[in-house]
Amino acid sequence: MFKKMDKKAAQRIAMEYRAMISKESLFSIGQNSNNIYEWTAVIRGPDGTPYEGGMFNLSIKFPTDYPFKPPKFTFKTPIYHPNINDEGSICMNILKDKWTPALMVEKVLLSILLLLEKPNPDDPLVPEIGQLFKNNRFQFDQRAREFTARHANN
């Protein structure tokens, strides 16, 4: 049973990868040449946000029972954000309890872009940053811009 699940996961991952590289997108992706279960992605910081101009690297690791379990998305580029911690973990419901097999990597990446545009300070992974976002948006934006300039200018 495990091998059958593993094969189905690999087929789905390969299909999603082919679909994503065959069209223009808001992000670029790559695949570990030795492991189909490991991808990289680069997201450009959305215009009009403190992340504008930044290039953010992420790793994507798929479980062997994908798509029944979500892949793990991790920011490798440090980012100042209430829903992303120092280890690069992302607090997003579609990566946890709202995950369904119908979701695909492209949809998650688009959701991450939206999270950069509209952080959710009411469900922060980093409470101090969430509080700053709510109480002093100017200072939050300034810190996020400085962090982006320091870490995300590839």
UniProtKB/Swiss-Prot annotation:
SMART domains listed in its UniProt record: UBCc
Catalytic activity of the protein: S-ubiquitinyl-[E1 ubiquitin-activating enzyme]-L-cysteine + [E2 ubiquitin-conjugating enzyme]-L-cysteine = [E1 ubiquitin-activating enzyme]-L-cysteine + S-ubiquitinyl-[E2 ubiquitin-conjugating enzyme]-L-cysteine
Active site feature: C91
Biological processes per GO annotation: protein ubiquitination
Pfam families from the UniProt entry: UQ_con
Enzyme class: transferase
One MF term in the entry's GO annotations: ATP binding
Pathway entry: Protein modification; protein ubiquitination
Cellular component terms (Gene Ontology): plant-type vacuole
Domain of life: Eukaryota
Keywords tagged on the record: ATP-binding, Nucleotide-binding, Transferase, Ubl conjugation pathway
Entry's induction text: By biotic stresses.
Residues covered by the UBC core domain: 8-153
EC number: 2.3.2.23
Family statement drawn from the similarity comment of this UniProt entry: Belongs to the ubiquitin-conjugating enzyme family.
Role description: Accepts the ubiquitin from the E1 complex and catalyzes its covalent attachment to other proteins.
Protein name: Probable ubiquitin-conjugating enzyme E2 31
Organism: Arabidopsis thaliana
